[in-house]
Amino acid sequence: MKKNRERFCNREREFVYKFKVGSQCLELRVPLRFPVQENASHLHGRLMLLHSLPCFIEKDLKEALTQFIEEESLSDYDRDAEASLEAVKSGEVDLHQLASTWAKAYAETTLEHARPEEPSWDEDFADVYHDLIHSPASETLLNLEHNYFVSISELIGERDVELKKLRERQGIEMEKVMQELGKSLTDQDVNSLAAQHFESQQDLENKWSNELKQSTAIQKQEYQEWVIKLHQDLKNPNNSSLSEEIKVQPSQFRESVEAIGRIYEEQRKLEESFTIHLGAQLKTMHNLRLLRADMLDFCKHKRNHRSGVKLHRLQTALSLYSTSLCGLVLLVDNRINSYSGIKRDFATVCQECTDFHFPRIEEQLEVVQQVVLYARTQRRSKLKESLDSGNQNGGNDDKTKNAERNYLNVLPGEFYITRHSNLSEIHVAFHLCVDDHVKSGNITARDPAIMGLRNILKVCCTHDITTISIPLLLVHDMSEEMTIPWCLRRAELVFKCVKGFMMEMASWDGGISRTVQFLVPQSISEEMFYQLSNMLPQIFRVSSTLTLTSKH
């Protein structure tokens, strides 16, 4: 059969088209190799252009060419089919082998015959956890998570104390050395001692880092195994000992004096809430909130001295595997790590509690680095190919060298995502890359940071994130150049752009109601906060309240 098919493939036929121009009879002959791989419309256009054919034959030529290709192709298919049947009849082809080949191909390409994929451990655990957190056992789960949280907090407290003692001891040693500088000691002695101090700090930090990593890994394994066992036991109605295990009271939470010293106190927040309508014909309703708060307040676990420990995680846990996820936007630099700034603070908060569902923040960042490296490599190779095929100049060479030098960095406006189950009110963190340009007062709606917000909102629509927290001024901390006019201009720009993006969302997700939280730094004044609050109803169409009065 294969020989017969090769016989009919790559056969050349001549297409003949006759037409009249005035009193002249002309003939167009074009050799075509079958099967024709090119689109008939494209081939027709090339013939018109190549032979300078008159426009009045364009339609007729296209019909004739299309008909010729279809007829000749069908003839080839018929001859191929007849030759295949003859091969089967003559015994040249094994009928049973042919039938088994067809059956295998059909089974591999048909869904009803496809083998079901075996669920992974993560999928099984997610289903089990979702069932338990929506059952009376939810309090038991949160109690266990809290006990693990206290254990890690104690460990971190011990680490901080030991590091503090080491730094104090090293500070005293350095002071003594500085007093002897120029007398019995030289600059080389000071540098040598500083290097020893740095190495000692690194060794101690690595020791505690490994211990924390090991402890969280053990906790995660114990927790997941316990959740699976609890789910299996709950299915057994004869297990009477389980009812006592589930009835764990909040008073049984373990407290520690050292951990209390590391409590995150809730600072006084300013907050305004609005209900808005967007769209003229297809109206969608959304909730907007303006808050004066630290972005990391939505991540930190909070405690209440009077009533013991109070974790604000019940709603977060209930919606972990739902279609109502919560996210926030962190403004970061172009390096994918957790070594400085808000990235370090965020990583510290993530380490406060073991993540029982997703990889550690460090592991997720390593994956992001590999993805960015692959993407940059692909872009660089394509850019190099385009430069090699076109005209090269100095500017393009500089651009290529710059891309090669920063291939592990993200660009302004790009963002990467991390997933979390161990934060207070957040499931997803968008790490949006911005540069110092956002601190200037002349950014526009086409600025990379603004376009990054648009792409983030689009991801929210496509991945069931219904609550998103955004830094309104595109900064996490205030500085001297951020005057009142600067704040008003920046807030107006972000409000208007987000409004436009939310109107786009109606076409992306069908108009699902969402909550957008605009956060301003805590150092902003109350007067400035209320000016921003008064600006919001002027940009968004706020729902008016209806007052009902009874008639006597």
UniProtKB/Swiss-Prot annotation:
Name where it mostly resides.
Answer: cytoplasm
What is the annotated localization of this protein? Answer: Cytoplasm; Early endosome
Keywords for the protein's UniProt record, in alphabetical order: Cytoplasm, Endosome
**This protein is called what?**
FERRY endosomal RAB5 effector complex subunit 3
User: From what organism does this protein derive?
Assistant: Pongo abelii
How does this chain assemble?
Component of the FERRY complex composed of five subunits, TBCK, PPP1R21, FERRY3, CRYZL1 and GATD1 with a ratio of 1:2:1:2:4, respectively.
Give the matching InterPro entries: Fy-3 (IPR019311)
Q: What does this protein do?
A: Component of the FERRY complex (Five-subunit Endosomal Rab5 and RNA/ribosome intermediary). The FERRY complex directly interacts with mRNAs and RAB5A, and functions as a RAB5A effector involved in the localization and the distribution of specific mRNAs most likely by mediating their endosomal transport. The complex recruits mRNAs and ribosomes to early endosomes through direct mRNA-interaction. Plays a role in mast cell degranulation.
- Any one Pfam family here would be Fy-3
Region annotation (Disordered) ranges: 383-403
A GO cellular component term found in this entry reads: protein-containing complex
Biological process, per Gene Ontology: regulation of mast cell degranulation
